[in-house]
Structure formats: structure tokens, C-alpha cells
Amino acid sequence: MDIIGIGYMGFETANLDAWREYGPQVMGFGVGKSPDSDLESLYFRIDDRRHRFAFHPGRVDRLAYIGWEAVGRMAFEAGLRKLEAAGVEFVRGDTAFCELRGVREVVRFRDPVGYQYELFYGQKWTPRSFIPGRPHTGFLADERGAGHVVVITPEYTPELERFLLDVMGFHWYGAGAGKGRTGFFRAKLNDKTSHDIAYGHGPGRMGVQHVGLFVRNVRDVGETYDIVRKRELPMMMTLGQHSQDPHLSFYHFTPSGFAFETIAEIEPWQGDPYELNPETLSLWGHEMVGPILGPSVRTPEEVLDAEYLAGKKR
């Protein structure tokens, strides 16, 4: 599929009030206008798109959906044919649902693990409209997508890899330097970053491990790092640089229990002409000062929505 990357992500949270302050004041997100049909939810902006992250009221903190952006209508329709040929069931969003997401067209379907995917094109935007919630030089999104996400899967199966590689058309990036079974994947049209999504094997567990966001300046990483430390927010990894990409980053936990990785490019990503097998996760730093799996990672029964669980029981 001709996919740019992740266009948006949606979460359910029992901590909306915490996100109202945390999003703008810690991360520098702009606060978007909630649709009239979803006034209870919180919509965040990191660029001129109508929104990139949505937080909906929920009983537990969990990933609700990942919106994958097709480059345009022709690519979207080709993607639907790909889903049909693979026997993947999908549901088209009606006019009201498209307006809710702020897109021209959208379909919903599941990956083999049960995570909710959406494929869309034509997200609403307003030029030069992004205003950060605090002094911040801004985020890198646009042609690379909103960022990357690492999710946990209770079973890492060949079916999952076939779905990601053959149906979604993602590129295989590698297994990283972790100790467990992990796969990193990149959308077909993303040539700016190493991966858009990774699946890590955690027997009996599901949920978001972390979300990675690129900022425009090293200063944004440093200032966010200072804010996190001054507020004594829980951290996963200290400032450091991974072995496989020339980026500076650190990880800290959000009010929903998953981590944000705040990333600045030291130099452009070098591409992946061959698969690497790094000896260590990082060249320097990235000291593990918190759990690798936060409270956002739970049992599948806690993380999956009721509709999906009911369908599995039938």
C-alpha cells in the first residue's frame, strides 16, 4: 500500500484531566477543537493538521486505533483492493465518521493481534495554524507521519508478519537490539525514519510500550527533559543515542502509562541498504531508570475493546 505513515492515533483514557495540562505544558502540543459530536474528547495538534492525537474517555488507558495515511484517493482504493484480496474484513466510515476523523474517506479493520487499524486519506489541515502549548520550535510530521509506535503482542506469528509485509506493504527494518522477539516495520513511502511501528513479543500481554515523536531542534529535547525532571515525572530511559540511527532521545511515562520518546535528528537517517544487528541498544546514555513495560501494557482482555472480544467468543 502507498502509505506515508501514521496520520493519527486515538487512545482511551481514564485520566483526561491530567492530559489537559500534560499535553500542552509538558509536551508542547497544541490543543485542537473537538468535533461537535465528540466534545468530551481531547484532540492534540503537533502541526497544521486538524489533529494527530485524540484522547477519549474510557474505563482503562489503552490504544483505541491507529490511522494509516494513504497518499491519496487512488492509493486508498488500491489499498481496499489489497484488503479484499487478502480476505481482511473492513468497515467503511460513513459521512459522520469521516467528519469525526477529519478525513475524506476512511475504513476500519484489525491486524491479526486485534489492534484497530484505520486507512484514510485527505486529513483536514490549515496552513500555518499550529500554535504550541508552550515555547517550542515544533514537531516533524508531514511527509514522515505523526511518529512511531511500539506495541506488545501476546504471540508473534508468521501471520502477523505476512499481514504487515504483504497486505500493508510495509518494509521490514529489523529486529533491533532487544532481548525478546521484536519486529520493526516502516510504511512504504516513508524514507525519513527507520520505523513506523514495531511489535514486541510479550506472552499474555498487550498494549502500547511507547510512542516516538520527532521535534525540530535539539533544544526541544533538552527543554522537555528539564520539564520532566522538574516535575518529577517517571522516566523510562535517560538521554541517549540508539545504535541504529543518528538521533538523540529520551523516554518518559505519560499519564496513560505508556512512554513518549522525544527525538531530535543529529543528522538525517542514513537509510537501510542492509539489515543491521547491533551489539547494544544505544551508543551512549539511555540508562534504564524505569520499567521497560509501563502500566499501559496489560492482559488482552483489559486492552481489547468489548466489541472485538464479543466477536472472538462467538
Which residues make up each language-model segment?
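Conserved donor-binding loop and adjoining core beta-sheet/short helix segment
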Residues: 33-71, 92-96
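Short, charged/polar, Gly/Pro-enriched secondary-structure boundary elements
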Residues: 49-54, 114-117, 191-196, 257-259
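A compositional/structural signature marking long, glycine- and acidic/polar-rich segments
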Residues: 177, 182-246
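Conserved active-site tyrosine of GNAT-family acetyltransferases
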Residues: 19-24, 83, 114, 159-165, ...
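Vicinal oxygen chelate
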Residues: 5-14, 58-155, 183-188, 232-314, ...
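Core segments of cupin and vicinal oxygen chelate
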Residues: 1-51, 151-194
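N-terminal beta-strand motif that seeds the catalytic metal site of vicinal oxygen chelate
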Residues: 1-17, 63-66, 124-158, 206-213, ...
